């Protein structure tokens, strides 16, 4: 499973951990993906969707 939203395509971003001593190490910010049973092309499917898409109503949940 790729860490990517199947609706909007949101992917991990690269950032930095910064300590109190200002030591910088790279880190990843992963999108908040949820497994949702949703209707796509008239059929129910299991999708990995970010919470922004769920809250915005881009996902129609299957019964």
UniProtKB/Swiss-Prot annotation:
GO biological process per UniProt: translation
Domain of life: Bacteria
GO CC entries: ribonucleoprotein complex; ribosome
Pfam families: Ribosomal_L28 (PF00830)
GO molecular-function term, one example from the UniProt record: structural constituent of ribosome
Alphabetized NCBIfam families for the sequence: L28 (TIGR00009)
Protein name: Large ribosomal subunit protein bL28
Organism of provenance: Desulfosudis oleivorans (strain DSM 6200 / JCM 39069 / Hxd3) (Desulfococcus oleovorans)
């Amino acid at each position: 499973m790729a860490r990517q939203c199947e609706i909007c395509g949101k992917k991990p971003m690269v950032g930095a951990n910064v300590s109190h001593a200002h030591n910088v190490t790279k880190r990843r910010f992963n999108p908040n993906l949820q497994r949702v049973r949703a209707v796509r092309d008239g059929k129910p499917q299991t999708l990995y969707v970010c919470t922004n898409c769920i809250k915005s109503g881009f996902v129609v949940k299957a019964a």
